[in-house]
Amino acid sequence: MEIDNKARIHWACRRGMRELDISIMPFFEYEYDSLSDNEKQAFIRLLECDDPDLFNWLMNHGEPQDSELYQMVKLIQSRNKARGPVAM
């Protein structure tokens, strides 16, 4: 997936678990444009992971082995925490 194809990335942000939608969608909407190209690639790679893995990582029940994915999970968590709750 290309880093500038925002429609496809937005669609990939839609997950099968509401908990993931609450974490991933606001991050994409509010933060994606400010990411570096490398961070955008890591975000896209993260979206290719299975929902159970994403859920566990974002809820601090484990972490990805890949260091770039780990950094992206931490970035999503910190930016979402700083922004506060978002109604969906």
Swiss-Prot record:
It is found in: Cytoplasm. GO terms for biological process: succinate metabolic process. Pfam families: Sdh5. Keywords: Chaperone, Cytoplasm. SUPFAM superfamilies: YgfY-like. Its main location: cytoplasm. InterPro entries: SDH, SDH_sf, SdhE_FAD_assembly_factor. One of its GO terms (cellular component) is cytoplasm. Belongs to the SdhE FAD assembly factor family. Monomer. An FAD assembly protein, which accelerates covalent attachment of the cofactor into other proteins. Plays an essential role in the assembly of succinate dehydrogenase (SDH, respiratory complex II), an enzyme complex that is a component of both the tricarboxylic acid cycle and the electron transport chain, and which couples the oxidation of succinate to fumarate with the reduction of ubiquinone (coenzyme Q) to ubiquinol. Required for flavinylation (covalent attachment of FAD) of the flavoprotein subunit SdhA of SDH and other flavinylated proteins as well. This is FAD assembly factor SdhE. It comes from Yersinia pestis.
